[in-house]
Amino acid sequence: MAAPGPGEYFSVGSHVSCLTCLGQRLQGEVVAFDYPSKMLTLKCPSSSGKPNLSDVILINLAYVSEVDIINDRTETPPPLASLNISKLANRARTEKEDKLSQAYAISAGVSIEGQQLFQTIHKTIKDCKWQEKNIIVMDDVVISPPYQVENCKGKEGSALSHIRKIVEKHFRDVESQKTMQRSQAQQTQKDSSLSS
């Protein structure tokens, strides 16, 4: 490994090129370097090809056979961006609530189909929760097992109609996905029988 020796560091903002033990060449701007663990963080052009995005890659220098500094940054790096702590706390709280909701559904014995439907609804309408095996949406609509359109109950109105449309679309999408997977499996089976 041609990594820095004792007392040597990668400067934030420098551009480096690394060759991994798998022969993969990685090139990018140094975002961070932790000397004790020999972990290097690079910001690289996006693998999606989108110009306004970047990939951030963590590299363990123990698994790198070569490191070349392309352009060493000599000036002081720009100050770190400030963090919106309340926004981060809200996101962490929301993620925790989502995970607890998933865990509740699993422990309550809710079917995979019910869990998937809950996730689909939750993407659009955050105000949904579990009540035993029932999905409660906006405290107005109850969806009971087996979670089909006809299992949506509530007072007639736009909320019930909207939820029924989401449920209907969810199962339509699931069915079209299954059909596509079956046709791909049949094509693969057909291709393998032709090659034998």
From Swiss-Prot:
CDD domains: LSm12_N. It comes from the Eukaryota. Disulfide bonds: none annotated. Residues 81-175 form the AD domain. Pfam families: AD (PF09793), LSM12_LSM (PF21166). Transmembrane segments: none annotated. Belongs to the LSM12 family. This is Protein LSM12 homolog A. The gene is lsm12a.
